[in-house]
Amino acid sequence: MKILLTGHQGYLGTVMAPVLQAAGHEVTGLDVGWFADCVLGPAPTDPPGLRIDLRDVTAADLEGFDAVIHLAALSNDPLGHLAPEITYDINHAASVRLARLAKQAGVGRFLYSSTCSVYGAAGDGLVAEDADLAPVTPYAISKVRVEKDLDELTDADFCTVSLRNATAFGFSPRLRADIVLNNLVGYALLTGQVLVLSDGTPWRPLVHAADIAEVFAAALTASADEVRGEKINVGTEANNVTVAEIAEVVAAETGAAVRITGEAGNDPRSYRVDFSRLRRLLPGANVRRSIADGARELVAAYRDHGMTEDLFTHRFVRLARIRELQESSRIDAGLRVMP
């Protein structure tokens, strides 16, 4: 299949592109390039790509593709709070516009990278895809809005699937240090402490970036009649853990001491997720990597590739990177690339 992969120079896209290529797909990327040089270790080999702001994509850019995998977004809650209106502009309006243009261009399948954050404050019970949604951040709200708008676009000729990823972890050449496991491991190696700013009680489902990539690859080739219009949680119940439990895993792999301060106050985002629909609809997608696997992988990568405090707190933190691009006049207040 000919695949357009948006966000191919991001954390997930850099892992996903080679997985898709190994499965025999012809991959073209689309990325604005904010994080292209945010690399730890050897530079990845990117697929051919279009350097375009998501808000400026045209139908002509999408012609000839069999499927679009849409990863590109302002990718976490702190970025959403930085500029909520821009979060909605990019994550919601531009994403739905992309889907409409893809349908207009004759693309048959649209895989949307959603999030388990749509469940928000769900408590201790397992939540499945038909649960009431309770997003608590602009990032999560934007994802819910896109899912609803995709429902209106879905028909016999345009198969949309919203894949609700658990919180990602694991090494990517274009690393992120602002997601929970990656952050805790890095801080532990740099300081000797596993620092948890919440009280440690919120539940989080975690999933390795490579497992996410394999799920998307499976969704590409699944029967359209089986997956059309579906919302599918991406992860495994084995990785439903509290933040304190994640910290204990990191301590075991690094030898660092756990320190739970609670200074950030109560985090309303807490949810345990049911992944049985994934196993039923995409049985070939084997989510298999544990949190301990990811912690060991990250420890080795951080040590082998020379992680430093400056890299950890700036290059690989999305909010810090956006601010750096703005302060150096490479992007403007609307997050558009400066001429």
Predicted regions and their residues:
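Conserved Rossmann-fold NAD(P)-dependent oxidoreductase catalytic core, especially the SDR/UDP-sugar
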Residues: 96-138
